[in-house]
C-alpha cells in the first residue's frame, strides 16, 4: 500500500471525524508528526512524499489507538501544561488547561503576600508591579503541600515559578509517583520536591505548611454517563471520581488540613464548576474562611481560596496590644462595633482563643444569643444579614461611601475623618490592612465606618440597590498577564451590579497607574451607557477631596 503524507492527512482526518473527534485535521497531523518523527514544516514542504513501510506501520498503529478513543496525550506520551511539557501515561490524569488557573492563583497570592509586607506600607508601586510578571527570586520561600500530585505538573510548575519554595507532593498511586519522579528529573527540581506515597495526609508526619494545594477527585459517579468516552475508558478513575456527590475529597481535606497548616496558612483547591457553594459550606463548617472563588476562562467557578486565620502576634502588634489583650477584648465584646465580621479575627475555632474556665461563653456583635465554644460557627451569610441591619439603621439622608480594596486604609480612614456625617464601608481581603484601619481609627476616635474583611463578591449582591452615594476603586490589582485579565475587579457584569447599587447621580471613582488598564476601564464605562465621565478632558486631574497615599498618582 502506498501512502503519501497528504493522503494520510486526508484519510486520517476523515476517519477521526467519522467517530466524532473535534479537530480531526489537527489530530491527524499531530499523529503523523509523532509517528514519523518529523516537524510540521516537513509535512508542509513534502505533501507528496511517500511513507516507507516502517512509517506506514507506525502511522497506522497510532491512528488505530486514536480511533479507539485513546486520548492523544497518552499516545504521544506528553502533555503541555503551563507552557511546559510533561510526561503522562494511563496512570495519571491528563493535565487540563483549567488547572492552570490554580497555578495563577498561587502565584498571585505569593506576589501579593510579598508586596503587602514591603517597606512602603503594603502599597505596591510601579516597579513592584512589574516584578510580579518577572522571575520571582525575590519572593520569600514557602513550604507547600500538594495532595494527589499525579503527573506532578502542579508542583513542578510552582517550583519553576517560585525558585525559593519547597514542595512535598503525595499520591496514593505508586505508578503515578513514578511518572511524577520522571517529570521532576526532566525539569530538574528533584532537590526541592519530595514525593511521598500517601493516602491524603497519612504519611506526611508532623510537617506544617504555608500552603496546601490540590486538584482532587471531584466528579460524582452520577455524572459518568455525561463524560467523554476517552476520559471514562482511559483515565484513572481514582483521580476522577469521589463519593458523596464528588465532595468526599473536600471533606477529608477540611477535616485534616488544620493539623498541617502553619498559622495563617492558605488552602487553594480546584473545584467542579457547580460545586462552589457546597465546597464553601464544607470549609465554613470546619472553621475556615473563604477568601475567594476564581473563575476559569469560560467564566466557570474553578478554584477556591481558603484561609486558616487565627489570632497572631502580627495582628497584635498592628493594633498595639498584647495577644492576651486582644483575646480579652473579644471575650468582653470590646472590639470596636464597626468591625463587620469578627470571624476572620477570632480564628479557626473558638477553642483557639484559649478561653479561661470562667469565660465559657461570649457574645458576637449584633447577636442576642450566647455562643458556646463548641457551637457551630456563624457563617458569612449570617453576618451579611447583620450588616444589612447596620446600614438600615442609618438615616436615609446619610451618605454612604463604599471603598473596594482599601489596602492599608490611608485613604479610607482619612475620608471617614473628614466626613463624620457620612458612613464609610470598606472591603479588603488582607488582614494587615484591616488591622491598620482599626489602629488608625482607635487612635483618632473615628467610628463612622463598617469593615468587611473578605472578598467583594460575598457582599456585593447583599448591598441594597440605590444605597450608595459613591464607590471608590483606587489602584486595584492590575492582573498584568493577558490570561489574568478576567480577574480584574471591574468587568462588564460587576460594573452593571455596582451601577444598580449607586443612587441616582451617585459617583464611581476609579484610579490606576497602569495606563492600558485605565484605558480599558474607560472604554468599559462608556459601553455601559449609564455613567457620564465628568473629567474626560483631563483624566490626570485629581477628584474632589483627593487624598495622596503612598502610591504616586500617575493617572486618575
UniProtKB/Swiss-Prot annotation:
One matching Pfam family: Methyltransf_4
Region annotation (Insert) maps to: 348-399
Q: Region entry RF MTase: which residue ranges? A: 1-310
State the superkingdom. Answer: Bacteria
Residues noted as binding S-adenosyl-L-methionine in the record, renumbered to the chain: 148-152, 171, 200, 215, 403, 428, 455, 477
What keywords are annotated for this sequence in UniProt? Answer: Methyltransferase, S-adenosyl-L-methionine, Transferase, tRNA processing
Q: Name one GO molecular function term.
A: nucleic acid binding
Give the SUPFAM superfamilies listed for this entry: S-adenosyl-L-methionine-dependent methyltransferases (SSF53335)
Annotated active site residues, numbered on this chain, are: 477
Q: Which family does it belong to?
A: In the C-terminal section; belongs to the class I-like SAM-binding methyltransferase superfamily. TrmB family. In the N-terminal section; belongs to the protein N5-glutamine methyltransferase family. PrmC subfamily.
Q: What is this protein called?
A: Bifunctional methyltransferase
Query: What would be the name of the gene that encodes this protein?
Result: prmC/trmB
Amino acid at each position: 500500500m502506498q501512502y503519501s503524507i497528504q493522503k494520510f492527512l486526508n484519510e486520517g482526518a476523515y476517519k477521526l471525524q467519522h467517530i466524532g473527534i473535534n479537530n480531526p485535521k489537527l489530530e491527524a497531523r499531530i499523529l503523523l508528526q509523532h509517528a514519523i518523527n518529523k516537524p510540521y514544516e516537513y509535512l508542509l514542504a513534502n505533501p507528496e512524499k511517500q511513507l516507507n513501510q516502517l512509517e506506514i506501520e507506525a502511522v497506522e498503529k497510532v491512528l488505530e489507538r486514536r480511533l479507539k478513543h485513546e486520548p492523544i496525550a497518552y499516545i504521544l506520551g506528553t502533555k503541555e501544561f503551563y507552557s511546559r511539557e510533561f510526561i503522562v501515561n494511563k496512570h495519571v490524569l491528563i493535565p487540563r488547561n483549567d488547572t492552570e488557573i490554580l497555578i495563577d492563583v498561587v502565584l498571585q497570592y505569593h506576589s501579593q503576600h510579598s508586596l503587602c509586607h514591603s517597606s512602603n506600607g503594603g502599597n505596591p508601586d510601579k516597579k513592584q508591579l512589574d516584578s510580579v510578571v518577572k522571575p520571582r527570586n525575590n519572593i520569600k520561600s514557602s513550604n507547600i503541600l500538594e495532595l494527589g500530585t499525579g503527573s506532578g505538573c502542579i508542583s513542578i510548575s510552582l517550583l519553576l515559578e517560585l525558585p525559593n519554595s519547597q514542595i512535598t507532593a503525595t499520591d496514593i498511586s505508586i505508578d503515578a509517583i513514578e511518572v511524577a519522579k520522571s517529570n521532576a528529573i526532566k525539569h530538574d527540581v528533584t532537590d526541592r520536591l519530595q514525593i511521598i506515597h500517601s493516602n491524603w495526609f497519612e504519611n506526611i508526619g508532623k510537617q506544617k505548611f504555608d500552603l496546601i494545594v490540590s486538584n482532587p477527585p471531584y466528579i460524582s459517579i452520577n455524572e459518568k454517563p455525561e463524560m467523554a468516552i476517552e476520559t471514562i475508558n482511559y483515565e484513572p478513575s481514582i483521580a476522577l471520581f469521589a463519593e458523596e456527590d464528588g465532595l468526599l475529597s473536600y471533606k477529608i481535606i477540611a477535616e485534616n488540613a488544620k493539623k498541617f497548616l502553619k498559622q495563617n496558612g492558605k488552602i487553594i483547591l480546584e473545584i467542579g464548576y457547580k460545586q462552589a457553594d457546597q465546597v464553601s459550606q464544607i470549609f465554613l463548617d470546619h472553621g475556615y474562611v473563604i477568601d475567594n472563588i476564581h473563575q476559569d476562562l469560560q467564566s466557570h467557578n474553578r478554584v477556591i481560596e481558603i484561609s486558616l486565620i487565627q489570632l497572631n502576634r502580627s495582628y497584635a502588634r498592628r493594633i498595639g496590644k498584647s495577644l492576651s489583650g486582644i483575646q480579652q477584648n473579644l471575650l468582653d465584646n470590646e472590639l470596636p462595633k464597626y468591625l463587620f465580621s469578627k470571624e476572620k479575627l477570632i480564628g479557626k475555632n473558638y477553642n483557639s482563643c484559649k478561653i479561661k474556665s470562667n469565660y465559657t461563653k461570649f457574645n458576637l456583635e449584633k447577636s442576642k444569643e450566647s455562643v458556646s465554644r463548641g457551637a457551630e460557627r456563624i457563617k458569612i451569610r449570617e453576618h451579611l444579614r447583620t450588616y444589612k441591619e447596620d446600614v438600615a439603621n442609618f438615616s436615609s439622608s446619610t451618605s454612604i461611601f463604599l471603598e473596594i480594596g482599601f489596602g492599608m486604609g490611608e485613604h479610607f480612614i482619612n475620608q471617614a475623618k473628614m466626613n463624620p456625617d457620612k458612613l464609610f464601608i470598606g472591603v479588603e481581603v488582607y488582614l494587615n490592612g484591616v488591622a491598620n484601619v482599626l489602629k488608625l481609627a482607635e487612635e483618632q476616635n473615628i467610628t463612622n465606618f463598617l469593615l468587611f474583611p473578605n472578598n467583594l463578591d460575598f457582599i456585593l449582591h447583599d448591598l441594597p440597590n440605590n444605597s450608595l452615594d459613591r464607590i471608590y476603586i483606587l489602584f486595584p490589582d492590575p492582573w498584568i498577564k493577558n490570561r489574568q485579565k478576567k480577574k480584574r475587579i471591574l468587568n462588564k457584569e460587576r460594573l452593571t451590579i455596582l451601577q444598580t447599587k449607586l443612587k441616582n447621580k451617585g459617583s464611581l471613582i476609579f484610579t490606576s497607574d497602569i495606563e492600558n488598564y485605565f484605558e480599558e476601564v474607560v472604554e468599559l464605562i462608556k459601553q455601559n451607557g449609564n455613567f457620564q465621565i465628568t473629567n474626560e478632558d483631563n483624566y490626570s486631574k485629581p477628584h474632589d477631596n483627593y487624598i495622596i497615599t503612598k502610591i504616586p498618582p500617575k493617572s486618575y
